[in-house]
């Protein structure tokens, strides 16, 4: 079984440079990691708690340096996940909200659609199961195609059948990350690059983060470290 979705060329014009200033010795909330999850978290915290001192600690000198800008850039519609699961609900609602977010901020996001193609008879039951999941999850416009309909949607693909998801799209997540960072900063958050967190220690008022540039005491911390999360968990 295969899939096809087009992509957008990543923008080279968006600045993802992090601040070079050292992190504060104290803050109310620390966010560890300035990928798209950490930046979205900082933006939301700054909006909900405008008086809080929020500091984002990022190991690299630039934002979104790892998974965020090295993925396929696909906005997933929610086909694959177990119906009723948190991941399914968040994927469907998150895709819808992301399109709106990008449109409001002038970030190019293309609803290119996706076809998941069955090329062998043995793959047809799995394709039908994905179609059932898509319907159960409320994926907009998803439908099964026979071979003729598949050729109409994508003439360069050959298969026995396909699941078409017109709600699937692509976006430059570097641009999304830059917009989130700008919103977080506008809300009062600070973002500090070149500051890998090495570990944390609970205190009577929260926790103390040890990082390459010293220590930061925070009342609370949100760890959004992606592939580094397991190492931070061990070091906690």
Over which residues does each language-model region extend?
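Short loop/edge segments at beta-strand edges and connector loops
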Residues: 58, 111, 145-147, 193-195, ...
């Amino acid at each position: 079984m295969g899939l096809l979705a087009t992509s957008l060329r990543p923008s080279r014009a968006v600045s993802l440079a992090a601040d070079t200033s050292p992190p504060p010795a104290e803050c109310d909330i620390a966010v560890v990691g300035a990928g798209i999850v950490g930046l979205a978290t900082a933006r939301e915290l700054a909006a909900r708690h405008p008086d809080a001192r929020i500091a984002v600690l990022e190991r690299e000198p630039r934002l979104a340096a790892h998974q965020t800008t090295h993925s396929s850039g696909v906005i997933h519609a929610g086909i694959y996940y177990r119906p009723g699961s948190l991941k399914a609900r968040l994927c469907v609602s998150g895709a819808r909200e992301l399109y709106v977010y990008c449109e409001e901020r002038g970030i190019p996001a293309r609803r290119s659609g996706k076809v998941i193609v069955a090329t062998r008879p043995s793959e047809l039951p799995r394709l039908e199961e994905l179609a059932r999941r898509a319907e159960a999850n409320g994926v907009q416009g998803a439908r099964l195609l026979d071979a003729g309909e598949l050729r109409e949607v994508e003439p360069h693909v050959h298969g026995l059948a396909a699941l078409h998801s017109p709600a699937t799209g692509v976006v430059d997540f570097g641009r999304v990350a830059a917009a989130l960072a700008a919103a977080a900063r506008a809300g009062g958050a600070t973002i500090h690059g070149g500051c890998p967190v090495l570990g944390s220690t609970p205190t009577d008022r929260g926790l103390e983060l040890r990082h390459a540039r010293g220590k930061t005491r925070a009342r609370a911390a949100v760890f959004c470290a992606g592939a580094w999360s397991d190492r931070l968990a061990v070091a906690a």
